[in-house]
Amino acid sequence: MGVALITPFKSDGSVDYNALVRLVEYQVQNGVDFLCVLGTTAETPTLTEEEKRQIKKVVIERVNGRVPILLGISSNCTQTVLNTLKNEDFTGVDAVLVAVPYYNKPSQEGIYQHYKAIAEATDLPVVLYNVPGRTGVNMTAETTLRLARDFKNIVAIKEASGNITQMDDIIKNKPENFDVISGDDGITFPLITLGAVGVISVIGNAFPREFSRMTRLALAGDYNNALTIHHQFTELFKLLFVDGNPAGVKAMLSMMGMIENLSLIHISEPTRLGMIS
C-alpha cells in the first residue's frame, strides 16, 4: 500500500513542515510500502513551485531511502511536465505519477501523445493516473493498454475511474510488467481480487497500519480476514469524501492530533459526528 500524503498547513496558510515530518514518520513506522508525494490529496495545484520543491525535499530527507517515493508531476500542459523532468532534481525519487490532462478534455489520441512525450523524456518509471472525476475525461482501457505495451518505462496505472469493468479489462489484457493500482480506497479489496497489486490510499494517512494489513491480507489471498477489515472501514470511506478530498482525511488527522485544526478544513457537522463515532 502506498499513501497519497496530505499537505498540512499552519493558520497563516504556510506549509507546516514539522507536521509533515511527523506524518511521514507515522507512515513509515506503520508499515506503508511507499509514499506518493504531491498528488491530488496534497492539494498540489494550490501550492507554489517553491513549496513543491521544499515538500519534496523534506519528505525525501526524512524517508532517507526507507520506502520508495512516487512523485506527482501532473499538468494539463505537456510542455510543463517536460520542463519539470528536464529542470528539477529527481534524486531520491523512484517513479513519477502523471494524471490524464485535466480541463482540456483531450481525445484518446491526445492522451496517448501526452504520455508518449513524457515517457520518451525520462528514464524514470512512469505511473499513469486516470481520475475522470477530476480531469473531466476518462482514459479508456484501450489507450491504457496501448501505452503499457508501447513504453517499457510506463509501469503502472493508478485507476480511479470507478469503472470496475474497465479496470478488469486492463488487468486481463495488460503486459506482464504493468501493474494496476487502485486509486480509490473503497474498491481496493474487490480490485485486488481481480488482480490489482495494491492501492494509493487516502485513508492510509490516518490509518496506515490497518489499511496496509487489509491490503496485504487480500494480496496473500486471505480474503475473509481482508474483507473483515474492509467492512470496518466502509462507513469511514463514505464520510471522508462527503465534503471532498482532502477535507475529510485532514479533519480526521486533526482529531487525532496529527495536524493543526484549521477552519479551512471544512466538514459538515454530521460528517464530524460520524467520524467521532
Question: What kind of region is each of these model predictions?
Answer:
Residues 28, 60, 119, 168, ...:
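Structural signal for well-ordered, non-membrane alpha-helices
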Residues 3, 25, 61, 189, ...:
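Generic alpha-helical structural context detector
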Residues 3, 9-136:
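Active-site beta->alpha loop and helix N-cap motifs at the rims of alpha/beta catalytic domains
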Residues 20, 52, 56, 81, ...:
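A general structural signal for well-ordered alpha-helical segments in protein cores
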Residues 265-277:
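Single conserved hydrophobic/aromatic residue that forms the stacking wall/gate
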Residues 121, 134-237:
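Catalytic alpha/beta core domains of metabolic enzymes, predominantly
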Residues 224-259:
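Shared catalytic-loop signature of beta/alpha-barrel
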